[in-house]
Amino acid sequence: MQTKYNTDDLRICEIKEVIAPILVHEELPITDAAAETTLAARKEIHNILTGADDRVLVVIGPCSIHDPVAAKEYAQRLKAVKDELKDDLLIVMRVYFEKPRTTVGWKGLINDPDLDSSFNINKGLRIARQLLVDVTSMGMPAATEYLDLISPQYISDLIAWGAIGARTTESQGHRELASGVSCPIGFKNSTDGTIKIAIDAIGAAMSPHHFLSLTKMGHSAIFSTTGNEDVHIILRGGNDRPNYDAVSVEQVAEGLRKANLRPNIMIDFSHANSLKQCQRQLIVGEDVSAQIAHGDHRIMGVMVESNLKAGSQKQVEGQELVYGQSITDGCLGWEDTVPLLHELAEAVRKRRVANPDGSLKI
């Protein structure tokens, strides 16, 4: 029955149709090489999480992607280091297209690919998928953060590892998403530094769920998931207090054990652990490498923000951006990235000597 009252969409000023995921897949199909890269990396990460593989997972790359050309150059460089250190590290490139904002700001390449507030999301989805096809086809597995709950249908077949950020770890929708995606997932501790929410999220994501979402055809549907066994915690610090140190690792491992979860811990070298100073990631890396070298198998992975050029830059209208430099959080430059990766690889080799049976991972 019609009514003279309008109660809906009162704050919506425009609605544009978005291209269906299946059409983007058909337009930019996954290649055999990309599929092989992604499937192999997922299995290797699973083996690291179960203790069958004693390497350390390294998720490394730009804070966010804004220039696909620079991203591909970074991927080519990283692939060479990945191959060189493959016996000790599993290196996966951080390819982040969505940025959670504390208040407002540029939300990432998918949301605003032209960096001009035109919000051409259809273009952003295509650029993101094309970049992932290119990167994974060259043998470089990709990692991303799942922020929007619809965009995974456009890109998830090309993702080897995913993150749920500190601001969304408590979200029921993201826990449900994590229970159904085909890749391993890391949950970050809260922005205030507490870990219980992340531990709860791990338990939730390991369980089956039933929820509403969109199919690749773009239709609303009820999704039923099996649960995801390949989930773990990421320590990123909080309230300007780091939690990468050995005492914090022990406390988190104990919290995981009390929840009957395997003590798999990834450490984010950036964010509150670096006090938001990108070069301090090297200090964090030195400390974490020492913990690994002394035999701690609970540290199964690390996350690093790195780019071709160090630091970050602000967008200035009419001014060309510096090639290969972040426009969001500051990153390590390439000249610091390679030595850090070698330091981590050396730590893994020392761990094999110090604790060959992995007895510190209970």
Roles of regions detected by a PLM:
Residues 68-80, 103-110:
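Glycine-rich loop at the start of a catalytic domain that most often binds anionic cofactors/ligands
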Residues 61, 267, 333:
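Conserved, mostly hydrophobic/aromatic
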Residues 9-49:
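N- or domain-start disorder-to-order transition segments that initiate the globular core
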Residues 57-70, 329:
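Conserved phosphate/anionic-ligand binding catalytic regions in large, soluble enzymes, centered on
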Residues 49-52, 82-86, 130-139, 225, ...:
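Acidic (Asp/Glu)-rich catalytic clusters
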Residues 2-9, 88-244, 248-249, 271-272, ...:
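Active-site-facing alpha/beta catalytic cores
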Residues 307-354:
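Internal helix-turn-beta structural module
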